[in-house]
């Protein structure tokens, strides 16, 4: 093969063995005296030819040029002692590379399909994030971290009467605002949390105190969400619901219930009762363990001041003496 001019057209039959992928190919010369080196394309017939190879002008080539996929930089990076590198926990969540490649974070190094090793703290924290609730015959996972600011929406208010007749308090002022980007995700997890908690709290008959005061329209749950809650409640819980007391009902709530009354069963409609202040509520249920949010108390105080001011103005207007005619 001496004197034969090499062209850029390479044939597969000229390579009886696979080209080396892990070892570097010398760019300047092919040294045939190295016993550890794989035979190249010019040593097929046993002839040792020392000829300089020119890298083809293409982006993906097997020659070790500057634009080659198998460059010296990558070969040197592949020979790094992995055991000598610092682990992410020892190196502030970053790997140190010896070349000019960007330094990825640990989340970028972990690829799909790899197994993430948790520390004891992370494992404990992840266990707290998710909680299983049994609704009907199925188990549902709830993202407890996502709904953490809204868990006060439902609480246990003690018992009433004889036996384990539970008082369940539902405070709408703790609902998320509808303008949040993850609103649907929050409401879905909050729905499971409310239904699952309700089944845990209720043993026999129960009542729901619906605190509607101090709630903006953006925090009001939709009618579909409330209807879904009622439909997902177990039949036993729907039957054992003895009363739904709506405290500080707004005009919107009363109008909504009036419009939907034809579509609600008469038995459920008879369970609804409006209460306009906390004093009236205290006459119906024991308030010892009923947690009233501070915003509800402030809301009632402001309403009382406005009402008192209006009454005073009316009384002062009646007490003014009539003007004498001139």
Swiss-Prot record:
Pfam families: BNIP2, CRAL_TRIO_2. Coiled coil: none annotated. Implicated in the suppression of cell death. Interacts with the BCL-2 and adenovirus E1B 19 kDa proteins. Residues 147-304 form the CRAL-TRIO domain. This is BCL2/adenovirus E1B 19 kDa protein-interacting protein 2. SMART domains: SEC14. Keywords: Apoptosis, Cytoplasm, Phosphoprotein. Gene3D superfamilies: CRAL-TRIO lipid binding domain (3.40.525.10). The keyword Phosphoprotein applies. CDD domains: SEC14. One of its GO terms (cellular component) is nucleolus. The keyword Thylakoid does not apply. The modification Phosphothreonine is found at residue 87. It is found in: Cytoplasm; Cytoplasm, Perinuclear region. Its main location: cytoplasm. GO terms for biological process: apoptotic process; blastocyst development; centrosome cycle; positive regulation of MAPK cascade; positive regulation of neuron differentiation; positive regulation of small GTPase mediated signal transduction; response to oxygen-glucose deprivation; striated muscle cell differentiation.
């Amino acid at each position: 093969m001496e004197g034969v001019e090499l062209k850029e057209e390479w044939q597969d039959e000229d390579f009886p063995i696979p080209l080396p992928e892990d070892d570097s190919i010398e760019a300047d010369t092919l040294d045939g005296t190295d016993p550890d080196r794989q035979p190249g394309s010019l040593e097929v017939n046993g002839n040792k030819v020392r000829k300089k190879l020119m890298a083809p002008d293409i982006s993906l080539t097997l020659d070790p040029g500057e634009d080659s996929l198998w460059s010296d930089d990558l070969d040197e990076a592949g020979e790094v002692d992995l055991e000598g590198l610092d682990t992410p926990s020892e190196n502030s969540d970053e790997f140190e590379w010896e070349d000019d490649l960007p330094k990825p974070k640990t989340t970028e190094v972990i690829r799909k399909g790899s197994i993430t090793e948790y520390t004891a703290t992370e494992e404990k924290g992840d266990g707290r994030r998710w909680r299983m609730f049994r609704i009907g015959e199925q188990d549902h996972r709830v993202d407890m971290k996502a709904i953490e600011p809204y868990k006060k929406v439902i609480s246990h208010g003690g018992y009433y009467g004889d036996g384990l007749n539970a008082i369940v308090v539902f405070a709408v002022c703790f609902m998320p605002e509808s303008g949040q980007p993850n609103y649907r995700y929050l409401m879905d997890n909050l729905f499971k949390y409310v239904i699952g908690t309700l089944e845990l709290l209720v043993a026999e008959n129960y009542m729901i105190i619906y605190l509607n005061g101090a709630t903006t329209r953006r925090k009001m749950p939709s009618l579909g969400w409330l209807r879904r809650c009622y439909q997902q409640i177990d039949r036993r819980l729907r039957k054992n619901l003895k009363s739904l007391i709506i405290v500080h009902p707004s005009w919107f709530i009363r109008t909504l219930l009036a419009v939907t009354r034809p579509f609600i069963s008469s038995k459920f409609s008879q369970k609804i009762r409006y209460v306009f202040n906390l004093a009236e509520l205290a006459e119906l249920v024991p308030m010892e363990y009923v947690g009233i949010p501070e915003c509800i108390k402030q809301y009632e105080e402001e309403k009382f001041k406005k009402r008192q001011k209006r009454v005073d103005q009316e009384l002062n207007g009646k007490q003014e003496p009539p003007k004498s005619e001139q």
